[in-house]
């Protein structure tokens, strides 16, 4: 637990530093992260993924491969959720969030900030259960890719992880395995 807490504090410091844009502090935080990895360089992403996999196999024994606490909160409502979204053929094709994203990316361009978008998938097991069409989800991911392309920004596209066991904490939020993949993408982007 001490190792996990130390890694969390190092990561917290790294993200605070990135948000503040202080490159000296960023380099110091990266050195701490590398030292915490035990290999004197990059974090051992394969080992971190394996650790997340091992923990998931022990802790997430349900049909959606999510955290047991989240599953227990969801379980009483499962019967009424089955197939409920089968008519969601348009998915998330419209909404003010896409304009918000464009506004954010335009602001980044105006200020000379180089962002990276992370396309976080939804839990494919759960979304299939509710009948939310895979094609609608794919259109949603594609729309984000196109917006990123319009603004020439990099994308960490994790949309192919919808069916990765132990990737999610609950129906849509990242779990341990998901965070390892996001962390690796961010590490590579800011390296």
What are these regions (language model features)?
Residues 103, 107-110, 146-147, 188:
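Short basic/hydrophobic patches in alpha-helices and adjacent helix-turn junctions
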Residues 105-132:
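Active-site segments of SGNH/GDSL-like serine hydrolases
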Residues 100, 108, 115-116, 183, ...:
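Functionally constrained cores in energy, signaling, and assembly domains
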Residues 24-27, 34, 120, 127, ...:
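A sequence-level detector of short, solvent-exposed, charge-rich linear segments
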Residues 1-109:
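Secreted/periplasmic serine-hydrolase-like ester/acetyl group-modifying domain
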Residues 79-84, 119-122, 145:
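Generic detector of short, locally flexible boundary/turn motifs and exposed helical patches
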Residues 71-76, 112-116, 153-156:
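Short coil-to-beta-strand
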């Amino acid at each position: 637990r001490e190792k996990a807490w130390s890694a969390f504090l190092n990561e917290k410091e790294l993200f605070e530093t990135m948000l503040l844009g202080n490159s000296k502090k960023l380099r110091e935080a990266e050195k701490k992260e590398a030292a915490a990895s035990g290999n004197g360089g990059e974090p051992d992403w394969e080992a971190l993924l394996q650790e997340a996999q091992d923990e998931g196999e022990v802790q997430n024994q349900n049909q959606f491969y999510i955290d047991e606490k989240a599953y227990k909160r969801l379980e009483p409502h499962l019967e009424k959720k089955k197939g409920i979204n089968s008519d969601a053929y348009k998915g998330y094709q419209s909404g003010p969030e896409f304009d918000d994203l464009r506004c954010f990316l335009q602001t980044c361009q105006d200020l000379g900030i180089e962002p990276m978008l992370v396309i976080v998938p939804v839990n494919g097991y759960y979304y299939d259960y509710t009948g939310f069409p895979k094609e609608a989800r794919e259109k949603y991911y594609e729309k984000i890719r196109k917006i990123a392309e319009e603004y020439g920004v990099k994308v960490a596209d994790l949309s192919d992880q919808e069916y990765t066991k132990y990737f999610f904490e609950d129906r849509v939020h990242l779990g341990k395995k998901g965070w390892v993949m996001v962390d690796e993408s961010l590490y590579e982007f800011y390296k």
